From Swiss-Prot:
Binds directly to 23S rRNA. The L1 stalk is quite mobile in the ribosome, and is involved in E site tRNA release. Protein L1 is also a translational repressor protein, it controls the translation of the L11 operon by binding to its mRNA. Part of the 50S ribosomal subunit. GO terms for molecular function: rRNA binding; structural constituent of ribosome; tRNA binding. PROSITE patterns: RIBOSOMAL_L1 (PS01199). One of its GO terms (biological process) is translation. The lineage of its organism: Bacteria, Pseudomonadati, Pseudomonadota, Betaproteobacteria, Burkholderiales. Belongs to the universal ribosomal protein uL1 family. The keyword Ribosomal protein applies. This is Large ribosomal subunit protein uL1.
Length: 231
């Protein structure tokens, strides 16, 4: 773990671990603690009231953030024929079938998102052991296995983030960069929270959104009052 700077230690001392901060105040604290020379990402962790060990309570999906993430995704598409042309026209960085699979097997993967037309899954299915551990395996639940490859590419380029609850019942996502103003960060977080609410499992009982905290790539985490999140 990287050592905290004097500034980060001072700010960490100002953050009350049990206090719920208004979103604007939480972001201000996080930005003050972000001392890296690069434009750090602003990340969020959302504790959900689910038992992730139960298959019917696994929360997974994708949402296009209204203000993007501050990073343009590199997109690969497995498709052929007309679908391949649609993907290229939509801005896909790499498009192919067996040739693209060969590149993946060789370790040549210059992309952040993988999308597949349904008929391409016969090829993509052989790449599970490579793409899966990297979080790149296409899945219909997050819209990356779809006949509408053009829309999927546009969504990925527009700042779509995928989310999946971990074993502890927590969702981790990036909602922007330190350079974003508070309104954009708040709008992005509101969109994510809305998507999570819509993904609530029917079997989830009690309080669903339990805790929300924001942090920068290398900074401290600050808990947020969910009542102050709405855009």
């Amino acid at each position: 773990m990287a050592k905290l700077t004097k500034k980060q230690k001072a700010l960490q001392g100002k953050v009350e671990s049990t206090k719920l901060y208004a979103f604007a105040d939480a972001v201000a604290l996080v930005k003050d603690a972000a001392t890296a020379k690069f434009d750090e990402s602003i990340d969020v962790a959302v504790q959900l009231g689910v038992d992730a060990k139960k298959s019917d309570q696994v929360v997974r999906g994708a949402v296009v953030l209204p203000h993007g993430t501050g990073k343009v995704a590199r997109v690969a598409v497995f498709a052929q024929g007309a679908k391949a042309e649609e993907a290229k026209a939509a801005g896909a960085d790499v498009v192919g079938m067996d040739d693209l699979a060969a590149r993946v097997k060789a370790g040549d993967m210059p992309f952040d998102v993988v999308i597949a037309a349904p008929d391409a899954m016969r090829v993509v299915g052989t790449l599970g052991q490579i793409l899966g551990p990297r979080g790149l395996m296409p899945n219909p639940k997050v819209g990356t296995v779809t006949p509408d490859v053009a829309t999927a590419v546009k969504n990925a380029k527009a700042g779509q983030v995928q989310y999946r609850v971990d074993k502890a019942g927590i969702i981790h996502a990036t909602i922007g960069r330190r350079s974003f103003d508070n309104e954009k960060l708040q709008g992005n977080l509101a969109a994510l929270i809305d998507a999570l609410n819509k993904s609530k499992p029917a079997s989830s009982k009690g309080l669903y959104l339990r805790k929300v905290a924001v942090s920068s790539t290398m900074g401290v985490g600050v808990r947020v009052d969910t009542q102050t999140i709405s855009a």
